[in-house]
């Protein structure tokens, strides 16, 4: 009797998922050194991966890879890795409801019969057929990136100021199939519905036609903005150097630029170099870049870290608090400390019933029954913190039209300029008084910080006199 021994190949199936890996890189490093470090980190990360695991999306300071939980744990222990986070779903923060003025020598423009949200941000007392006052040239020279479902860039509201930036949704057309992104863009920079009237709108598609997506796509969108921001920074430096040379400056001075706002020269400081520095100082060397994130999902450390990283490069972020009627600190990007997080307020200056709250919310802005642009060249009324955040994005662009604030400074300025309105609602929506703040005069009464550009308007008037 022959005993046949059969050797069986046992295949162990390990569950793999998409993980976001962020490197512990300093954004102030010069680009050459950062590139070397990044390539080295990628090489070492690939050595950690198993043969059936792979890196998919690469970003400025990290990547997305399909790997097992055990590999992710090993990756976390690498000294160059800041964090490893499982990719997670995100979606729009909007709730659907189907239902210009004249120049002044003061530098202020009035739009009559403006949408109530604009009137409120401009400080108008009458919100019914109210007037919206805003600085002349508001938004000029500012690029606002709308990371969303896309933007209908041909919509009449944008008057040629909108362009397509990038599309990170696989197998989807380069257009807004939903309407949410177009609505947000209209609140930011529409000629009738916008807080600013001259800002440039750049569409970055990270959500599909259903308003859904993944955190990894958002990170790709942020990475795209970083690359465009750094490219514009180089262009500004080159323009400043050209201005110096055209004014008779020495052409034998070699400038070494590392992507930051500092220079190193190949020869000691001389009067000619000082003239170059003076020429450069007359330029706004930091591009004026704003990102609107009217999206949300559960708190994600990788997304918050990416926003902080980009903010350190000079990019301003406005995020929606979310519509769960819960603590905004439990969601991203609303929990980001580097962004300005906006909750939704009503025309009665109360917190909208759906808005998230808590200490992570910096200001409240109009978010109920907001009229703005929609796909198909139409307009629509929509509610949500998705509509509140674009009011803040527009305000950021308005401030940047006149002042060169870095993100931290401007966040403090906008919070400081907010109007503190007594909350008359009976809904104890957070139950902790973490936010809104108790009144200094009556601890039983709460104050809502409502987004307002009144103080900016006063500064512009004084500046124009």
UniProtKB/Swiss-Prot annotation:
Disulfide bonds join 329-360. One of its GO terms (biological process) is sporulation resulting in formation of a cellular spore. PROSITE patterns: SUBTILASE (PS51892), SUBTILASE_ASP (PS00136), SUBTILASE_HIS (PS00137), SUBTILASE_SER (PS00138). Keywords: Disulfide bond, Hydrolase, Protease, Secreted, Serine protease, Signal, Sporulation. The keyword Disulfide bond applies. The active site is at residues 148, 180, 386. It is an enzyme of class 3 (hydrolase). Residues 115-447 form the Peptidase S8 domain. GO terms for molecular function: serine-type endopeptidase activity. It is found in: Secreted, Extracellular space. Residues 1-17 form the signal peptide. It comes from the Eukaryota. The keyword Transmembrane does not apply. Its main location: secreted. InterPro entries: PCSK9_ProteinaseK-like, Peptidase_S8/S53_dom, Peptidase_S8/S53_dom_sf, Peptidase_S8_Asp-AS, Peptidase_S8_His-AS, Peptidase_S8_Ser-AS, Peptidase_S8_subtilisin-like, Peptidase_S8_subtilisin-rel. Residues 19-90 form the Inhibitor I9 domain. Pfam families: Inhibitor_I9, Peptidase_S8. Its EC number is 3.4.21.-. GO terms for cellular component: extracellular space. May be involved in the degradation of proteins for nutrient acquisition or possess a regulatory function by proteolytic activation of proproteins. Belongs to the peptidase S8 family. This is Putative subtilisin-like proteinase 1. It comes from Encephalitozoon cuniculi (strain GB-M1). The gene is SPL1.
């Amino acid at each position: 009797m022959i005993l046949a021994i059969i050797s069986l190949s046992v295949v162990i199936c390990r569950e793999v998922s998409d993980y976001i890996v962020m490197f512990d890189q300093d954004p102030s490093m010069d680009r050459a050194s950062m590139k070397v470090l990044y390539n080295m980190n990628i090489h070492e990360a690939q050595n950690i991966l198993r043969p059936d695991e792979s890196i998919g999306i690469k970003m400025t300071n990290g990547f997305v890879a399909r790997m097992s939980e055990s590999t992710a744990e090993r990756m976390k222990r690498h000294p160059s890795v800041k964090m490893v986070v499982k990719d997670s779903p995100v979606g729009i923060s909007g709730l659907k409801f189907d239902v210009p003025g004249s120049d002044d020598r003061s530098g202020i423009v009035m739009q009559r019969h403006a949408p109530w949200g604009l009137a409120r941000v401009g400080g108008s007392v009458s919100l019914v057929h109210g007037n919206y006052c805003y600085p002349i040239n508001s938004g000029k020279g500012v690029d606002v990136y709308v990371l969303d479902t896309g933007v209908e860039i041909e919509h009449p509201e944008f008057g040629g100021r909108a362009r397509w930036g990038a599309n990170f949704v696989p197998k989807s057309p380069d257009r807004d199939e939903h309407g949410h992104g177009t609505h947000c863009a209209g609140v930011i920079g529409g000629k009738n519905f916008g807080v600013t009237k001259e800002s440039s709108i750049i569409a970055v598609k990270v959500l599909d036609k259903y308003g859904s997506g993944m955190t990894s796509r958002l990170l790709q969108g942020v990475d795209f903005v970083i690359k465009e921001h750094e490219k514009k920074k180089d262009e500004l430096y080159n323009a400043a150097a050209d201005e110096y040379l055209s004014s008779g400056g020495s052409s034998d001075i070699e400038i070494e630029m590392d992507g930051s706002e500092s220079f190193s020269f190949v020869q000691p400081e001389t009067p000619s170099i000082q003239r170059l520095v003076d020429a450069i100082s007359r330029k706004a060397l930091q591009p004026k870049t704003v990102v609107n994130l009217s999206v949300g999902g559960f708190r994600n450390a990788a997304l918050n870290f990416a926003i902080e990283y980009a903010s350190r490069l000079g990019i301003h972020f406005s995020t929606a608090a979310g519509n769960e009627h819960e603590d905004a600190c439990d969601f991203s990007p609303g929990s980001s400390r580097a962004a300005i997080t906006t909750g939704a307020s009503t025309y009665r200056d109360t917190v909208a019933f759906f808005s998230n709250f808590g200490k992570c919310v910096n200001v409240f802005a109009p978010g109920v029954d907001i009229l703005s642009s929609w796909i198909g060249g139409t307009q629509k009324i929509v509610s949500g913190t998705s509509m509140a955040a674009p009011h803040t994005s527009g305000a950021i662009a308005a401030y940047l039209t006149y002042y060169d604030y870095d993100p931290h400074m401007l966040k403090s300025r906008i919070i400081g300029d907010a109007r503190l309105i007594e909350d008359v609602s009976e809904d104890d929506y957070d139950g902790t008084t973490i936010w809104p703040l108790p009144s200094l005069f009556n601890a039983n009464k709460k104050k809502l910080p409502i987004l307002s550009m009144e103080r900016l308007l006063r500064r512009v008037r004084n500046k124009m006199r």
